[in-house]
């Protein structure tokens, strides 16, 4: 028996919306971090945690975040410009 408000696409839609909200909030973090990687270079991204900074840098570099876990995350100067949130997701 299915709930009254259940439809086949509701779980996928709910998950997509949750992922989009998490991504939006990750990019709105007030902190700044410089993420450096030997193969991809360096980028300044919003920073709520080191993992969030790596996730944001992976989006900018268009790579899987698991492949850049060896990246270094450093505190960035507040005057440095932050990379824009990519639209390609």
Specify the residue positions occupied by each region the protein language model found.
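Short, mixed-charge low-complexity intrinsically disordered segments
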Residues: 2-6, 13, 62-89
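Charged, low-complexity intrinsically disordered regulatory segments in eukaryotic signaling
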Residues: 2-27
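Short, flexible coil/linker segments at or flanking structured domains
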Residues: 15, 21-23, 33, 49, ...
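Short aromatic-glycine-(Arg/Gly/Cys) micro-motifs in beta-strand/loop hairpins
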Residues: 20-41
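Short, contiguous acidic and Ser/Thr-rich linear segments
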Residues: 41-48
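A short, charged, amphipathic alpha-helix used as a generic interaction element across diverse proteins
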Residues: 48-69
